[in-house]
Amino acid sequence: MYKYITILGAAGQIAQKLTATLLTYTDMHLTLYGRQLSTRLHPEILEHERVTVIEGSFQNPAKLEQAVTNAEIVFVSAMESGSDMAAIVKALSRKNVRRVIGLSMAGLSGEFPAALEKWTFDNLPISYVQGERQARNVLRESNLNYTILRLTWLYNDPENTNYELIPEGVQFNDAQVTREAVVKAIFDILHVDDETPFHRASIGIGEPGTHYDKPSFH
């Protein structure tokens, strides 16, 4: 079990839910990194004795390196920019941090069924998709021990934490998954006895039984 984790992009929805979960159910020490966190995070989080808050962007090398110093594992809440991911990889390498979990979008490898793939790419800006693809490529080409979590379409439901893991190369049929389920999946991965299946792996997270042509909430 890890003792020290850094969460990059700590103001994101999944990042905030993960922060709350880790503070409630573990004794981990969290370093939260992102822009304007003092106004975007709840005061209880900002003042928690096991939380260190560092404000900055991914393009601020000194602050970024400060944030990952002493981290045993780093969580990247969004992989949307190749240049940002390159900066993260550089900071982790300089501080000798090897373990990283990053959130990416599903569908970049043609793993969606045709109808869901068409709906997905019809509803996302080309620039966003390109940024996701570039960021993923940067991480995969690094020497880090990464786990890329490929997420289908997201929604919120605190009562629904159902998820399934879809290995790389397997068709990804699930059209949706809750952010709460994603947090549970991350929590479970952090607690596995054998991390081998997650080493330098790309794994999808979906909600079982949601084999739709588009998310049910659209």
Language-model features: locations:
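Residues in the short beta-alpha loop(s) of Rossmann-like NAD(P)-binding domains
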Residues: A11, R35-S38, A106
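Core catalytic loop region at the nicotinamide-binding pocket of NAD(P)H-dependent oxidoreductases
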Residues: V192-P215
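NAD(P)H-binding glycine-rich loop region in Rossmannoid oxidoreductase-like domains
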Residues: I5-T6, K17, L37-R94
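Glycine-/Pro-rich loop/turn segments that contact NAD(P) or position catalytic residues
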Residues: E80-I166
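Substrate-positioning beta->alpha
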Residues: L149, N173-D188
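A conserved pocket-lining segment of Rossmann-fold NAD(P)-dependent short-chain dehydrogenase/reductase
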Residues: Y163-V177
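N-terminal Rossmann NAD(P)H-binding glycine-rich loop of SDR-like oxidoreductase domains
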Residues: Y2-Y25
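Conserved glycine-rich Rossmann-like NAD(P)H-binding loop of the short-chain dehydrogenase/reductase
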Residues: T26-R35
